[in-house]
Each structure stands twice: as structure tokens, then as C-alpha cells.
Amino acid sequence: MSAHLILIDALNLIRRVYAVQERPFIQIKQDHDDELSASTLKQVLFNTQNTCVNALIKIIDQHQPTHALTVFDSQEPCWRYQLFEGYKKGRKKMPDHLANKLIDIQDAFMEQGVDSLTSDEDEADDLIATLAVKMALHGQKVTIISTDKGFLPLLSPNIHIYDYFNRRYLDEEHVQSKFSVKTSQLIDFWTLTGDNTNKIEGVSGIGQVTAAKLLNQYGSLKAILEATDLKDSLAEKLTQSLEQMDLARKLLTLKQDIPLGFNLKDIRLTTSSSAHEINANINLTTDDKS
């Protein structure tokens, strides 16, 4: 029997839950041109924590994993901000009261037998990618719980992505329907178009339709750049954007080689009686060659 690891993109879950819990009070706040009272904030945070814990329980119950981990972003800027100071520029900052509540939510997750992972240097996305790929290389199943499209390039027979809020898997069919390219072409696709969500610029004048058309015709960005039959105007745009495309690719590509320093058995669910016997010695560090 194989292992099944659930990786929860914690802030993706928590921020969405918080927004739903806060929403009923937003209009009241606007009508009175005032901040929410301390008691109201306390109730919103209490509801957020309870809803997140209930979501965790539902996820475990639905997917029946043998192992699970919630992965958090650090509150400190990651390496991508050092590479590009405009990364995620303009994105709404997490409210301090919610940021201060994260440790309590982590503790609540731990009470359910699910530990948390955070890195000061790397984003949760990089940690999740490293874990997912490591498990997949060992032939084990991974399900990533997130709505973040950045995980889509990881899709494989052993790596699945589940949107908890819309109750659906984000699969190859979803990628083709939304972007009109293959999963293996997504990084090239976003390198050309840019990623507005994270404020990553692409090639000026190339949108999703053109990018998809080029990738479907030539197969990859490398092949596009080597093509000799491009229109002069397009070839010029690409030539002028080589440096930007290199930066975009670095920002868009998730790390898969972060040293983690623990074994699969460390994150097994104690409620899974067989989990201790299932591949319990898989070393989730990058120096494991087994």
C-alpha cells in the first residue's frame, strides 16, 4: 500500500476563510466609517480558526491521506523579493490581527495531528513543490490543497491539486480549458504573458491568445526563440525582452530542492494505523538518493 501525502497551502486557505468571515461586517464598517470593534475582530478570528480546523477535518476525511502537513509563508520577504523588488507589489497586506492569530491556528491544526512547516527564506509554494516532487519521485501520491495556479506545472500521475472551495480537482483538462496549453508549457506561457497576480511582467504586446498560439505551433519558448519564420515585429519584441523573460522564468519556477531535514514518518497521521508501516523511511531531504 502506498503513502498519500496531503499538503495544505495554509495561507491560501486561511485568507479565503477569513475574507468570508469578515464580509458580513465590512458594510457595517463602511456605513459607520469606523474600524471593527475589538469584540467583533475577536469573533471574526475565532470563527476563522474554527472554520479552518473544520476544513482540515473535512479534507482529511475526504481524501483519507496517510500523511499530512500544513505549509505556511513566513512573514518575512522571501528570495523572490530580493530578486525583484516589485514582486507582488500592491497586494493587500495581511491584517496584523490575522497575522498574530496564525500561531493559534497552527496550534489548532497540531491538535488535529497535523504539523506545520515554514521557512524564512522560501515561500510555502517552494516548500510544497519540494515535498511533492520528492514524494512523486518515490512513487507516492501527493494532493496539494490550494487554488493557486502556480502549482499547476507540478501536475503529474502522482501529484494532484484540489480546490477545496470549489470542490474540484485542477487537472490537465482544467489547464487546457483555462490556458489552451499543456501543463508542461505553463512556465513558458506565463514567461511570455507575465503573471499579473504576482506583478511579474511578460513580453509587451503578447497576451494569452498569442502565447498559446505560439506554444501550440512551436512547442516551447526555446523553439520559439530559435524559429526563423517569425514576423519581424514579433521577433523584435522577443529579442528586446530576453532579460525580462529570464527574470520572469526564475520568479515563476518553484524550487524543488530545498533541504527539509525530516522523514515521511515524522508527518504521518496518528489516526492512520497503517501509516507507520508505509514507506516510513523516505527521507525528505535533497541528499537522499534512494
From Swiss-Prot:
Q: Which residues form a coiled coil?
A: none
InterPro entries linked to this entry: 5-3_exonucl_a-hlix_arch_N, 5-3_exonuclease, 5-3_exonuclease_C_sf, DNA_polI_H3TH, FEN, HhH2, PIN-like_dom_sf, Xni
Query: Which GO BP terms, alphabetically?
Result: DNA replication, Okazaki fragment processing
Q: Which UniProt keywords apply?
A: DNA-binding, Endonuclease, Hydrolase, Magnesium, Metal-binding, Nuclease, Potassium
* Annotated binding of K(+), by residue: L192, V203, I206
CDD domains xrefs: H3TH_53EXO, PIN_53EXO
Q: Does the keyword Magnesium apply?
A: yes
What's noted on cofactor binding? Binds 2 Mg(2+) per subunit. Only one magnesium ion has a direct interaction with the protein, the other interactions are indirect. Binds 1 K(+) per subunit. The potassium ion strongly increases the affinity for DNA.
Which major enzyme category is it?
Answer: hydrolase
NCBIfam families in the record: PRK09482.1
Q: Mind telling me what this protein is named?
A: Flap endonuclease Xni
